[in-house]
Amino acid sequence: MGRTLPALLSLLVLSSISLPRGLGKDAETFLSLQSRIQEIFKQSEKSVVRVKAAREQKADQKVRRMLKMGSGFFISKEGHVLTTGLLKDPDRIWIEHRNSYFLAERIGHDPLCNLSLLKVSKKPLDFTYVSFSKPKEELAVGSILVGVTCALEFKIAPTYGIMQSHEFLFGKTLFPTKMIRSSLPLGLGEVGAPVFDLQGRFIGITYAALPDLGSSFLLPASACSRIRDDLLLSGKVDYGWFGITVNRTLNKDNGFEILIDDFVEGSPGSKSNLRKGDVLKKIAGTSIRSRGELAQASFFARPGTFVEFVVERDSRELKIPVEVALRPMVPKNILAENGSLPDSNLTDSTNVGGNEDINGSQTP
């Protein structure tokens, strides 16, 4: 019977069917799940839009018109829409909402995470928006997720999957912050959509597809909130910077630890009481056990503030305040224009889940 449960779940989510006798409580569970997915879809469908961006490009005395589309969703009653970057420097942006079309302008863009904040010139008469609430605890592996997306020119529809893992890396490429890997299948036009848990809480935005694995990456709600706030305020995102170079090395317990290797000249790290060889333990109360967690700390650090570094030096634990500076240069996002992660990151030596160069360095 265990093998029949996933198949029955898929059938029940897609349509109402007659349940075979004898399933008992399992049948009630299936119907409850189906009903909950339908409720989440009904609650959120008026907030989701299809976003289109067009740009004219002249080449060889010919004008080529480029059109990209994706999903997006309202995040305020004023008509702000969060979506992916779509096209670089588009000539025109518009959204489709319940068979109506609305012009939009780009308020701001974050090249690091490839998110854009739009605002419609005229608000729809009947729309809702997605609220960002901070979850009390981290999303557990195996949690059921519900996405509401705009695939190609089809109607807005729900899709579902499970939370598979939290990831900091894709091959040897370091994500700007911790990502959620899910089993949500993403096709064309479905990047930029909101994803919810079964309580209807916003979990994240569809960020990138992994079609060969039947998986996808979601940018978590906490990161979306960080980006949204800065884009609303200034149209750009100011990320923090410590100016330290680190190495990941084996310790005496055959585990890994993060050592400070060097400092960028004139950086906050170089001006602090941190020293080369210090073992990083915590930043702003968060444990640092990998380069990904260091990148995460840098992602959420606000320029102009101080954060507390906890380091181990000569078998002693020290607490050292470090001022956060504005990151001098924001790298481009790693996504291809279609919302997929480039195949060049997946080679025999850099495959997902493969061995990582433990002596690699990073300067957050």
Where are these regions (language model features)?
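Active-site region of chymotrypsin-like
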Residues: 47, 54, 65, 121-130, ...
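Bacterial N-terminal signal peptides
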Residues: 8-16
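N-terminal activation segment of mature serine protease catalytic domains
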Residues: 21-86, 92, 140, 144-145, ...
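PDZ/PDZ-like groove recognition
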Residues: 185, 232-297, 312, 316-323, ...
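Short, small/polar residue-rich loop motifs at catalytic or cofactor-binding pockets
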Residues: 67-69, 89, 187-191, 213, ...
